[in-house]
Amino acid sequence: MATTVPTRVMNVIQCYSPPELHRGPIMNWKLIQLFNKALISPCDLATFKSVNESAMKAGYLVHPDCCGSSEIQKFLKNETFNPNSTFYKTFEEVEAKGELELLFDQLMHYASTYGTNHTQEGNGYVPNDEPPVIEFTKYKVILPATEEEIFEECYGMLKSGIAINEKTLNLLMEYIKDYHFLSKVDVDEIANKEAQAIFSVKTGKYPNQAISVLRVLMYLLTEDTAMLVKSKQSITRLKMIVEGMSSDERKNLNKILKERDVVLSTVFYRYKPIILAMKCSETSTVINRIRKLAVKNHKPMKVGFWERCFNPMDKTDAYIKEAKEKVDSLTAFKKAQLMQGILERINGQDTEGRMFVVRNGKVYVRAGYKPPCDEDYLFELYDVIKDSYVRNLSSKAITKVETKDAEDNVVVLERPTRIKLPKGVDLTLPTSEKNFVGNFPMGSSVVLAEKDNVIGIYWRNDWGARDYDLHLITKNGSHYGWNGDYHGEEFGKIIYSGDMTSAEPEAAECLYIERCAPNSVVAVNKFSGSANSKFKLFVAVDPDKNDLQRTRELKDAMVDPNKIVFEAEIEHDSNDTKNVVKIENGRMIMSNFGTGGHSRVPSVSMSKVIEEQSKVKANSYISLEELLIKAGFELVEEEADIDLTQMSKNDLIKLVC
């Protein structure tokens, strides 16, 4: 399908005079995804036109000063997707078919994919053999940046204190090393301790604090964790690693210990099993010296205030006083974690058991656990932390603007910072970069329209998986998706688009959901794929349409890409089922955690086990909008100082930190 170039873009193309051509620098395309910026890389007019023709098919426009990089093309290839690459062309088509017709179509499809061992070209038999392509009318913009500006973005993220996903951390480090900015990085300024440890190992720049040094050594040896765990299993593993090291590796370990023997002696007694596990012929002398120095250098461990503040016993006044004294030293992300933890404690006080989303994204349920809850004290503590969070935001809620007075003198005035939020999406406070779903903090929600809501997944074979399955399980136990119903009505209409088992070149599965449909969980299962695969989750909402009208108006399609209000790439490293959305009281609440199961269809019993605690968690996320207003920001729908409608993950991190 031909792409119509918008008039405003044609004006830029016709007026564009490219600078002197030179080979543009290379920046990993995933950093473009992270920052919505690309390194300055000029091009000729033909390249500018070609790049933006590709960009518009993905819903983007690329500034002429950054069109010359090959990484832009990789970025655009990844971002281009057709949400209408579904089994059936319209939801009406699904509704019109009987159960036997639906089954026959699916069996024909399976025979052409699994039945031929995927030797047939393309997606096999699919009724929607020519998926409709709908042009974008709204575009995100990729802007140019200097090498120094991209470094500041990377370094700012490291200093923010947010817990950073290791893959993101590797991207940041790669850029800082490749563009020779290492000398500008102070490792002690990297606020997140795990990120600090990984950065130190991979760059050779070490921190000064004792526990930070020990974390670095732990990651250096294990290559997968900086956590200081003293369990028998962990110590045994550490000893085996040291025993298996080469002579050069042991000498390097000895060198690091020797250079930091005094500082490590201050924590020797606290982490004695870990340090002794590093003992070998090359390190025995220095470890013995650390042990002797510990006699005079030992610093007793004090349990941190914030680790014990939820259980004050009868010292509530003293705890509140101490909280007020210490709260401003916390990062914004630690404050958000504490506030969310307080709300979970309060909202879950009448429930038995607790649900924890652990580091690998799996869910752990502690049955029968019921922590103490002093509601009055916890609300007071919550207000102390919230007030500090708002004070921090308030420093960014004032914008200075230059104007002229009656005598033509330049004067500087202050006004509230104008901020534009995504329409129809309620953003939550970010607690960790690991707890983002795409560019949105976990718990962010989409407000459902009365009728026209579509949630879907999209993938390609070359993303690591042939066959993903989209499922919806209602609170009543009804199941929609593969091996379940294709359509039905439980207070509101639910329709499934059909099962795709190959994505060559691409595939999508969708669910049509009305607002009055029952509370439900939407899950994604990987039926066939490798460990390092991914899919794109998207939500489209059209409040102006009713009862599938838009399928006729949009060339018989299921999804209008211009109505997509949420999209996120989600990595699926294991074979468990991922719960990606909780539908609760007219909202789609975004999540991303595995159930830990290995069944091909999500277990209804598992859903019931985590249902109660999922509801507690869903009701404990904190709205960003409420705190922005309290801090003094002005919410606008037009021209804004801060526009989060096209936000990158980094934009939100910079706003709150």
Give, region by region, the residue ranges found by the protein language model.
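Intrinsic-disorder/low-complexity signal
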Residues: 2-251, 255-657
